[in-house]
């Protein structure tokens, strides 16, 4: 039987902040009901330390989860049902028939944890809305 879980791809420029937080939050809240990926158009070497710290505050351990910035590929876009972009503009590939959303969010690059927390919280709010739109019940962490 084919896998009918929705596949969601989060894309930002460096795949070191917003898209990493979104992927981790969707994985946590969507559980096994969704397939989650993240990527960047120009990936950084490491995830932003303030992002790692902000996620640790809510019990998500990016440091030991194996999460690393990854390069956006055409295959990742083709495999996804929903592509959520976060500040990559025209650098993100477009394929007809895919559902695209562009989330306007502040970039946490170079910012401290106090600036990252509200970005994290806004991403979580949007993730909960996306789950509802996909017909997936959020898992209680």
PLM segments and residue spans:
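Short polar/charged helix/loop
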Residues: 1-141
């Amino acid at each position: 039987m084919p896998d009918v879980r929705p596949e969601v791809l989060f894309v930002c420029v460096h795949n070191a902040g917003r898209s990493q937080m979104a992927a981790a939050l969707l994985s946590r809240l969507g559980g096994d009901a969704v397939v989650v990926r993240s990527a960047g158009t120009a990936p950084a070497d490491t995830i932003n330390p303030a992002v790692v710290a902000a996620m640790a505050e809510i019990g998500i351990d990016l440091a030991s989860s194996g999460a690393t910035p990854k390069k956006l590929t055409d295959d990742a876009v083709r495999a996804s049902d929903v592509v959520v972009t976060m500040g990559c503009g025209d650098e993100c590939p477009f394929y007809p028939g895919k559902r695209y959303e562009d989330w306007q969010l502040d970039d946490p690059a170079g910012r401290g944890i106090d600036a990252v927390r509200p970005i994290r919280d806004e991403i979580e709010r949007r993730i909960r809305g996306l789950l509802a739109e996909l017909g997936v019940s959020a898992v209680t962490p």
